[in-house]
Amino acid sequence: MSARLPVLSPPRWPRLLLLSLLLLGAVPGPRRSGAFYLPGLAPVNFCDEEKKSDECKAEIELFVNRLDSVESVLPYEYTAFDFCQASEGKRPSENLGQVLFGERIEPSPYKFTFNKKETCKLVCTKTYHTEKAEDKQKLEFLKKSMLLNYQHHWIVDNMPVTWCYDVEDGQRFCNPGFPIGCYITDKGHAKDACVISSDFHERDTFYIFNHVDIKIYYHVVETGSMGARLVAAKLEPKSFKHTHIDKPDCSGPPMDISNKASGEIKIAYTYSVSFEEDDKIRWASRWDYILESMPHTHIQWFSIMNSLVIVLFLSGMVAMIMLRTLHKDIARYNQMDSTEDAQEEFGWKLVHGDIFRPPRKGMLLSVFLGSGTQILIMTFVTLFFACLGFLSPANRGALMTCAVVLWVLLGTPAGYVAARFYKSFGGEKWKTNVLLTSFLCPGIVFADFFIMNLILWGEGSSAAIPFGTLVAILALWFCISVPLTFIGAYFGFKKNAIEHPVRTNQIPRQIPEQSFYTKPLPGIIMGGILPFGCIFIQLFFILNSIWSHQMYYMFGFLFLVFIILVITCSEATILLCYFHLCAEDYHWQWRSFLTSGFTAVYFLIYAVHYFFSKLQITGTASTILYFGYTMIMVLIFFLFTGTIGFFACFWFVTKIYSVVKVD
């Protein structure tokens, strides 16, 4: 069973000096994952049964999580399948992030004693009579799950139990999940894990992995009297048709279930467990062997270098404009009494009387800016905490919990920004503004999320959010976020309107006919290309984490890409804004928001490409769920990038018109 495997279906989401040091510690490299335990996830000590105490346990509990598949967006709880169930045991409490991600951790019937070897121990036996409708339904669900390659996810001491095997490129891959079973097609083609053994050869037959060999590695605590700590748990799934079910010996042919089987079918579930001391692995670095088999770090460095090249290119362009062109423009404007010739050459000064003219649909723009500010700050703080190790994979659900809590608490800056800009746009309907800021964008996201949840409920998936959790989310929104938004809006409207460096003329200036490149749409389309070029490699790993259930842990890289994205959006927008001002087009507000916000359209196009080229998802429900959740991500990303572009352009316009003399 240790035969080499091809790659199976992917396994399963400027404080310069200080910041540089933090990022260097957070960027993953060889043996770097020890930083994951900064928040103080306490280790558990284990002892032999005769030495156990309150500080040193002998019993090792194995927990089971939801089962998922790369061929379906629908995960299912362990109890949805007809596997061996725990007779007793308390279900661990789950945080908000775990519930939103669909994690359902439950106790299992697999119980171990530290350092006690067990061989072919029977867990339970399941019997099916194909003539009984209930049994047939259970068996068909099991077959369908094997056909879609659903994967178990087991947990020991808050660590995933991994299945390690060789892949085609000679690398050792450790999968934090293992399949229920596999299928040989009616043409004799081995699907998924059926390639691991030549014993799986019967056509149109399912083979269920009803036995696991588990090996638990431990490291003795250096003090000696404190027992040992678990540093790894690995398993190998196997299939046996036990001849003596009451006394299984874990030998013989594999457990096959023909697609046309009838009569009585018995499946005995067994396991073997052994323990091995490993003094090379420390508890703080026990995730390394899993993370080092994840997508290669050098690809991430290529992504960073690619992004930095784009940033340097844009920075050079912006620096040339700011330091050379604008400097000369301003000097010549300020020196000339008769500016007729200068106006023909330097067009951006001509629009000084219209540059701060309120935009059309100023209400909507201010609402978008408020929500975008909320998302921008939330993303920055979440990624910063993730870099420090507080939101590592070991701290399950912490990333989503942190993001949701921050979004709720950041209602105040959202209301403040929306109110300040709406007032500067000359708006007077402050009640409408604050209500839209509180409910428009969050309402769209929640409506989409609720529709997706209805589909999950209908499919019986574990990813369906319980009614109580939905009520809790609504309570956080209405009882905390909305009042905080009103408070922020109150202070925003109370302050004086933003003072602009130049006065606005009463009569709008006529905008001359624009060339193709200075028209709004071409500029907006071009503006999103470079920011997207900075993130598309990182985007691949993020989508893999969400849809292919791979473990994402490279938050140092992600934070660097976040900073680069902010810089790129800002510089690309400033660059295009300058060209449009030189063409005497002063409608910069919406254009600046849409220029960088158009990056989200490229995100959507890439997500569509990813769905058809990388995923193996089948089924109408899974397809709707994929694109439904993708639209939520696209909207959030649109508000995030659009807000960056607007603020950058607002700063640029304010800066250049504040240093030029205007009669």
Swiss-Prot record:
Residues 322-374, 420-437, 488-522, 576-591, 653-663 are cytoplasmic. InterPro entries: EMP70. It is a multi-pass membrane protein. Keywords: Cytoplasm, Cytoskeleton, Endosome, Golgi apparatus, Membrane, Signal, Transmembrane, Transmembrane helix. Ubiquitously expressed. Especially abundant in pancreas, highly expressed in kidney, lower levels in heart, brain, skeletal muscle and placenta. Lowest expression in lung and liver. GO terms for cellular component: endosome; endosome membrane; extracellular exosome; Golgi apparatus; membrane; microtubule organizing center; plasma membrane. The keyword Signal applies. The chain crosses the membrane at residues 301-321, 375-395, 399-419, 438-458, 467-487, 523-543, 555-575, 592-612, 632-652. It comes from the Eukaryota. In the intracellular compartments, may function as a channel or small molecule transporter. This is Transmembrane 9 superfamily member 2. It comes from Homo sapiens.
